[in-house]
């Protein structure tokens, strides 16, 4: 047991399973077979807030470097690969322009507006990493200014203040206004999840209650989508962020009671979720262009295409994880020191 009331375990199998299903939900959304699948991003952000609250106090001034080692290598590799395709085979991509300015901004996690009028870096899913990097920067600064155990809570407060400013007085269309979107509050929900689990009330609630809470949280997302459609701005925090927070609290509570996912495939996909997340739009596009796979759950051929595409996405993401992502991170850790 750590001195903050949390168990000393460094790995939560249920969180890894949540990562797997969150990544697959986003994949299914981009396959146009799961209209609420983008809620996987909300789950990722809450997980990030929880995990950073877990690791930041022990990492101190090494926190930001460790986050860079974990996030940057694969993102840069995929970004450079997409840029090369945009230069050599632009017809393979839809809205990606091979401008050096866009490459530099993408590599530095600086948001920009593309020719189609949408915000987004060269890697289509890199927009979420811009918010992740903002959170990491604020946490790293907080570790310098406040006690380590309060750093993520202070960072969440700063992001909430930034979000409030963007909503009240921000200038639409600016980078600051874009980064101040309400979705950044979900990192704070992850911090709340961590603080709730610190209180010790977890052990006073029976296991079936936590299972029920997790099921209700998962069901709340498609239910809210069926009733209200895709929520925007602050409504998204209430309708998708809060259930994601309840889900993470429930899953970690179950881990703490040794009720954990033992499915090796799910845990492996969770470990590969970052690779799956960054690669899948291009794997889906390639499956469409090369094999003519058009996912559609309303027809048998479309259902088979959906299963085949999902399988190819999972396999390519897993291979990328074990052949590219993990070796790069390990090599950097050997040179720079261990990373969490």
Enumerate the predicted regions with their spans:
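Alpha-helical transmembrane segments in multi-pass integral membrane proteins
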Residues: 1-15, 21-37, 53-62, 112-121, ...
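Hydrophobic residues within alpha-helical transmembrane segments
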Residues: 17, 21-24, 40, 68, ...
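Flexible, solvent-exposed coil segments and beta strand-coil junctions
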Residues: 27, 166-169
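Short, solvent-exposed turn/loop segments enriched in Gly/Ser/Thr/Pro and often Arg
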Residues: 39-40, 84
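Conserved functional loop/turn residues at catalytic and ligand-binding sites
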Residues: 67, 327
